[in-house]
């Protein structure tokens, strides 16, 4: 039986299979999965290579949920409110060609066209001594982020913003030593520039949340 040559439509179908498989990886802690897109045989991939939570100029996974008043350690007099704000994360996204690509294949710049953040309580559940470990509602934003072909870009994004901290406190979250552990998962929607296809990729990182004392920082 004579074999039919692979047509342009066949190549496109092959690309779609690769595209679907590459876009369905699961997230992992302190980094994440990747996704790929492109045009027919030319495929470019985007990966979340690291997520580093940061607050008040320091890399930390300890999220302070409640703002306290700082006091003089000798007199006990109130000296002012402790430093407080959004807890962010430095997220690194790397744009690379598909592993089977050659040096002559076209490489695409990729644009993040939006992302969402969701929260889950980590394995082990709520500590027995905790007064509460409420579910946390995530958020979605249409922020655009460009990642040139062959390069990595690090951006500072909201990790646990003030709105989520307030939600945790108002819902009765633990504010003592029995701090619960959650994971924040970013789901990015990306598009190779000049191509109509979009794909998603994920990355997650764990954090502990309670009423941490940041006076003196």
Region annotations inferred by a language model:
Residues 2-14:
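Bacterial N-terminal signal peptides that target proteins for export
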Residues 20-23:
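C-terminal motif of bacterial Sec signal peptides marking the signal peptidase cleavage site
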Residues 25-217:
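Non-catalytic macromolecular-recognition regions in eukaryotic signaling proteins
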């Amino acid at each position: 039986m004579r074999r039919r040559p692979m047509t342009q439509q066949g190549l496109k179908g092959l690309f779609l299979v690769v595209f679907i498989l590459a876009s369905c990886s699961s997230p992992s802690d302190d980094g994440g999965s990747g996704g790929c897109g492109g045009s027919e045989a030319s495929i470019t991939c985007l990966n979340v290579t690291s997520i580093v939570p940061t607050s008040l100029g320091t890399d930390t996974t300890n999220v302070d949920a409640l703002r306290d008043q700082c006091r003089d350690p000798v007199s006990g007099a109130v000296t002012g409110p402790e430093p407080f704000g959004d807890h962010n994360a430095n997220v690194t996204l790397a744009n690379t060609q598909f592993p089977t690509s050659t040096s002559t294949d076209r490489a695409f710049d990729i644009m993040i066209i939006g992302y969402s953040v969701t929260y889950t309580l980590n394995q082990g559940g709520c500590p027995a001594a905790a007064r509460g470990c409420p579910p946390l509602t995530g958020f979605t934003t249409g922020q655009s982020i460009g990642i040139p072909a062959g390069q990595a870009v690090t951006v500072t994004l909201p990790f646990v913003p003030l709105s989520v901290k307030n939600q945790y406190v108002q819902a009765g979250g633990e504010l003592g030593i029995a701090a619960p552990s959650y994971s924040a998962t970013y789901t990015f929607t990306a598009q190779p520039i000049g191509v109509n296809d979009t794909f998603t990729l994920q990355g997650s990182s764990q954090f502990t949340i309670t009423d941490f004392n940041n006076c003196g920082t």
